[in-house]
């Protein structure tokens, strides 16, 4: 029986960046890795209602820099920045080094696999029919420019006695193409009948040039020299 590799893991260093970008010697590596895990666990719990897409961590010069990608930055920042200051102090206490918190806004949450999966999970917990929730998510993603999307839900769908899986796809989702920019994530819906798992794959297009093309900002076309007006001869 064929199994699917994680779409992010197989594309690391090709078209997908790492979630933690730091180097450490042998003595510090385990502590840093454990610190990253605890920081992410704390932030995901504290910001459960803030539509957090992903958390990236850097460790420059005995400090930690955390970037929170969210569709609702106002909730994370809080009134006059009070909430983000509390988060900074908590992260510094967990990591044991000075912390810096950056907030990055997700412009199109309908094209983010994590936010789409969380949205479907919240709808299922509110007893929305699973087919309606899946179809709505697919239509919104395609309307905003996705090349393809696939949504799969598994569990006691509709309160059925026997668990099953159903999926809905629109467009292309080329999992074997390594240059394809595929966003993948999962979520869980805790219903009265049990846990329903949600998986979302979103194909945003192909990236030619690999990580170098992602790192470089788009170059603006150079202004062409203006031509002299016709019909005027030399004096």
UniProtKB/Swiss-Prot annotation:
GO terms for molecular function: mRNA binding; rRNA binding; structural constituent of ribosome. It comes from the Bacteria. Residues 215-235 are annotated as: Disordered. Residues 39-107 form the KH type-2 domain. Keywords: Ribonucleoprotein, Ribosomal protein, RNA-binding, rRNA-binding. GO terms for biological process: translation. GO terms for cellular component: cytosolic small ribosomal subunit. Belongs to the universal ribosomal protein uS3 family. Part of the 30S ribosomal subunit. Forms a tight complex with proteins S10 and S14. Binds the lower part of the 30S subunit head. Binds mRNA in the 70S ribosome, positioning it for translation. This is Small ribosomal subunit protein uS3. It comes from Pasteurella multocida (strain Pm70).
């Amino acid at each position: 029986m064929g199994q699917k590799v994680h779409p992010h893991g197989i594309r690391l260093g090709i078209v997908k960046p790492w979630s933690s970008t730091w180097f450490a010697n042998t003595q510090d590596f385990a502590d840093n890795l454990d610190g990253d895990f605890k920081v992410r666990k704390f932030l995901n719990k504290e910001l459960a209602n803030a539509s957090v897409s992903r958390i990236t961590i850097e460790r420059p010069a005995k400090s930690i820099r955390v970037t929170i990608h969210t569709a609702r930055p106002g909730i994370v920042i809080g009134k006059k920045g009070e909430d983000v200051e509390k988060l900074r102090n908590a992260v510094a206490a967990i990591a044991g080094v000075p912390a810096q918190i950056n907030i990055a806004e997700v412009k199109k949450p309908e094209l983010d696999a994590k936010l789409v999966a969380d949205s479907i999970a919240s709808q299922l917990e509110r007893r929305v029919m699973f087919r309606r929730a899946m179809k709505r998510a697919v239509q919104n993603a395609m309307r905003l420019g996705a090349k393809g999307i696939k949504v799969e839900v598994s569990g006691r769908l509709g309160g059925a006695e026997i668990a099953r899986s159903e999926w809905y796809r629109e467009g292309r989702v080329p999992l074997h193409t390594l240059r394809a920019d595929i966003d993948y994530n999962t979520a869980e819906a805790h219903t009265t009948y049990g846990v329903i798992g949600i998986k979302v794959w979103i194909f945003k297009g192909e990236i030619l040039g690999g990580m170098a093309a992602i790192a470089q900002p788009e170059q603006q076309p150079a202004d062409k020299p203006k031509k002299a007006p016709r019909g005027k001869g030399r004096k």
